């Protein structure tokens, strides 16, 4: 069905002997154009995926992957999903165990807090900023994002503190940092890994 505006525009162009440009149809299965990102997934996609991961855990779809008893002294993680484009993890958080200041190399990331509360320290370019992420909160990590995540010590919950994380492309490396004098970061090491911090 053609709109009145489209018909009027076509008639106007024909009267001026202007040929409208030919539209090219792209097949639905045609590859997406390449972007500057290392993945076709965007941060918004990863946030949606982590939100779905939380729903799946709460619905019991991953019960077979969960420990029989929650370890309250050591962090653990379990992979919920993996393919060439995406890794999805369930991560536990215990008191006093920080991840260290790190990046995700060439991967984008996102998380949704399933239970409890996290405190994230992220590098702003000249200082560390802090944000608190409570159950249901989400955060995305663009390329170059440097942060340290820890269980929020000011919030006590009866069960474990858990979050679902997605990385695209899947993690292959992480660099670790320290804040140096004069307000800049110094890389301390880079490790090859296929597991989250």
PLM regions: where:
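A short glycine-rich, His/Asp/Glu-containing loop-to-beta-strand
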Residues: 66-95
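Conserved short histidine dyad/triad with adjacent acidic residue
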Residues: 89-104, 133, 142-144
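A short hydrophobic beta-strand segment most commonly corresponding to one strand
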Residues: 110-112, 156-174
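N-terminal leader/capping segments at the start of a protein or of a new domain
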Residues: 1-61
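Glycine- and acidic-residue-biased ligand/ion/polar-headgroup-sensing regions
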Residues: 95, 106-121
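Intrinsically disordered, low-complexity, charge-dense segments enriched in Lys/Arg
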Residues: 145-152, 164, 173-178
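Conserved double-stranded beta-helix
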Residues: 166-197
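Short acidic-glycine-tyrosine-enriched beta hairpin
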Residues: 110, 122-151, 188-192
């Amino acid at each position: 069905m053609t709109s009145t505006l489209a018909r009027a525009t076509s008639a106007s162009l024909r009267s001026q002997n202007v040929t409208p440009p030919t539209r090219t149809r792209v097949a639905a299965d045609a590859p997406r154009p390449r972007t500057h990102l290392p993945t076709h997934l965007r941060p918004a996609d990863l946030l949606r995926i982590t939100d779905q991961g939380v729903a799946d855990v709460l619905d019991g779809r991953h019960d077979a992957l969960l420990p029989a008893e929650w370890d309250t002294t050591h962090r653990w993680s379990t992979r919920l999903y993996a393919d060439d484009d995406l890794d999805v993890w369930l991560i536990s958080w215990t008191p006093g165990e920080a991840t260290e200041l790190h990046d995700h190399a060439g991967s984008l990331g996102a998380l949704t807090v399933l239970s409890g509360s996290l405190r994230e320290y992220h590098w702003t370019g000249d200082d560390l900023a802090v944000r608190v992420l409570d159950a249901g909160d989400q955060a995305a990590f663009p390329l170059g994002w440097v942060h340290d995540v820890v269980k929020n010590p000011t919030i006590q919950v009866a069960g474990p503190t858990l979050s679902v994380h997605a990385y695209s492309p899947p993690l292959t490396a992480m660099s670790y940092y320290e804040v140096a004098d004069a307000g800049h970061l110094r890389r301390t090491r880079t490790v090859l890994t296929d597991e989250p911090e």
